[in-house]
Curated annotation (Swiss-Prot):
This is DNA-directed RNA polymerase subunit omega. GO terms for cellular component: DNA-directed RNA polymerase complex. It comes from Staphylococcus haemolyticus (strain JCSC1435). Belongs to the RNA polymerase subunit omega family. Keywords: DNA-directed RNA polymerase, Nucleotidyltransferase, Transcription, Transferase. Its EC number is 2.7.7.6. GO terms for biological process: DNA-templated transcription. It is an enzyme of class 2 (transferase). GO terms for molecular function: DNA binding; DNA-directed RNA polymerase activity. Promotes RNA polymerase assembly. Latches the N- and C-terminal regions of the beta' subunit thereby facilitating its interaction with the beta and alpha subunits. The RNAP catalytic core consists of 2 alpha, 1 beta, 1 beta' and 1 omega subunit. When a sigma factor is associated with the core the holoenzyme is formed, which can initiate transcription. It catalyses: RNA(n) + a ribonucleoside 5'-triphosphate = RNA(n+1) + diphosphate.
């Protein structure tokens, strides 16, 4: 079971795919630099879960570019 629930995450970020990519990027950052943690305590022991908790709390928001370049 996903914790935090998907509907709670989608109230912050509308797209499941954007949630996944945002969480993955943030999890990599947390894994490489744990001192960048934004919450005082996490329920999850893994970086992906911690990233999802940050998204659910509103601490992390994705930056989306409308520009397409090749």
């Amino acid at each position: 079971m996903l914790n935090p629930p998907l509907n709670q995450l989608q109230s912050k970020i509308n797209s499941k795919y954007l949630i996944a990519t945002t969480a993955a990027k943030r999890a990599r950052e947390l894994d490489e630099r744990p001192e960048t943690a934004l919450l005082s305590g996490y329920h999850s022991a893994k970086p992906v879960g911690e990233a999802l908790e940050e998204i659910a709390s509103g601490k992390i928001t994705p930056v989306v570019s409308d520009e397409f370049t090749m």
